[in-house]
Amino acid sequence: MRLKIMELRYKRELEKLIEKAEKSLEASENLYNSEFYDFAVSRIYYSMFYCVKALLLTKEINPKKHSGVLKMFAKEFIKTNELDVELFEYINEAYNYRQTADYDATIEIKKEEAEYLLHKGHIFLNKTKKYLISKNILKGENDNTKS
């Protein structure tokens, strides 16, 4: 019943968040390929952040601050074992890289670090989409049914 209500209230926003997550990850790849590693890790973090916001919408939770988003993600999905703890580790790591990249001009993000985080970003997005598809909230790639 809760997911049916969510579908009516949040489905469009959830789909837009996943779209933003995909675009952020694509932008991070372009930035990585242009050797803008600091900017790439920031976009990778935001890709994960948008995924988490979409996941929280499935429980009708919509925190406004980054700290609230991460806290509620841990409470609602990680501590309940609904999703793997590695996803929380990935977004925390991405958050720390983003903080460094955005706010510490003396530290340069290395190519290997950006590449590593980009890989984690793809895993995060794929696992988010897989979860949403498994809950019949998001259509699968080959699903032509109406959502």
UniProtKB/Swiss-Prot annotation:
Q: One Pfam family for this entry, by name?
A: HEPN
Repeat in keyword set: no
Alphabetized, the UniProt keywords read: Toxin-antitoxin system
Gene3D superfamilies the UniProt entry points to: Nucleotidyltransferases domain 2
Asked whether the keyword Lipid metabolism is assigned, the reply is no
What SUPFAM superfamilies does the entry give? Nucleotidyltransferase substrate binding subunit/domain
Q: What does this protein do?
A: Putative toxin component of a putative type VII toxin-antitoxin (TA) system. Its cognate antitoxin might be MJ0141.
Family classification: Belongs to the UPF0332 family.
Q: What is this protein called?
A: Putative toxin MJ0142
